[in-house]
Design a protein with these regions (language model features):
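Active-site neighborhood of HAD-like aspartate-dependent phosphohydrolases
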Residues: 10-65
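A metal-dependent, Asp-based hydrolase signature
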Residues: 45-115
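Flexible loop/turn segments at secondary-structure boundaries
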Residues: 31-33, 39, 124-126, 152-155, ...
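Hydrophobic (often cysteine-bearing) scaffold residues that line and stabilize catalytic clefts
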Residues: 38, 42, 82, 130
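Asp-based, Mg2+/Mn2+-dependent phosphohydrolase catalytic module
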Residues: 1-19, 151, 157-188
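Substrate-recognition element of Asp-dependent hydrolases with the DxDx(T/V) motif
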Residues: 107-162, 173-174
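Short, surface-exposed alpha-helical segments at coil->helix boundaries
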Residues: 43, 83, 87, 154-158, ...
Length: 188
């Protein structure tokens, strides 16, 4: 804790001395932390989706989602967005389910995104120390941007961050799927 305070003072001092205009932060594991694993998140998403869908089992839904992501990765496609994932999941569900699955694709994607955002809001907590640093940077008139490799675009990230009132200081949100780029590639 003491080290982090010293580090934050050094960051603030550096920003003052060098007239820094922008500070960039990662979203997950920096500003907010998930309290469950990604696999648990998908399980919870599946359960919430099942409540709204005419699907007899959630297993096909979970398998369809994991299969789609695995196929994207096998094809070296790491720059996908949520709509692409859910469009492919929908197509798989149509293929494997009985005719009782009759939800419109657009509505399915909207519902899936809504549930995904809700679960992320429910199972994320803020990093108080980094948010305190945001406040101090903001007080220095440093603009704050979030950069994230996430399959939900900036609108979704803003909703997740917006559920945490302390994160209202953000000036800009950059999400990899909106730009078809990744931080890991140095493109974002």
């Amino acid at each position: 804790m003491k080290f982090k305070k010293v580090r934050n003072l050094n960051i603030l001092d550096y920003c003052k001395k060098n007239n820094i205009k922008w500070a960039f932060f990662d979203c997950f594991d920096t500003l907010i932390h998930r309290t469950i694993t990604e696999e648990d998140l998908i399980q919870k998403w599946s359960r919430r989706m099942i409540e709204c869908l005419p699907l007899e089992l959630r297993v096909p839904l979970i398998h369809a989602r994991f299969d789609v992501i695995n196929i994207f990765h096998q094809e070296a496609n790491f720059n996908y967005n949520y709509e692409e994932i859910m469009s492919s999941v929908y197509d798989r569900l149509l293929y494997i389910q009985n005719p009782s699955f009759s939800m419109d694709k657009k509505r399915f994607i909207e519902l899936a995104l809504e549930k995904e955002i809700q679960i992320n809001c429910d199972f994320c907590v803020i990093d108080r120390e980094n948010v305190a640093l945001l406040r101090e940077l903001s007080a220095l008139c440093v603009k704050i941007a979030v950069v994230s490799d996430f399959y939900i675009g900036a609108t979704g990230i803003r909703k997740i961050l917006g559920s945490k009132k302390e994160l209202s200081l953000l000036d800009k949100v950059f999400v990899s799927c909106d730009y078809r780029s990744r931080k890991a590639d140095g493109d974002l």
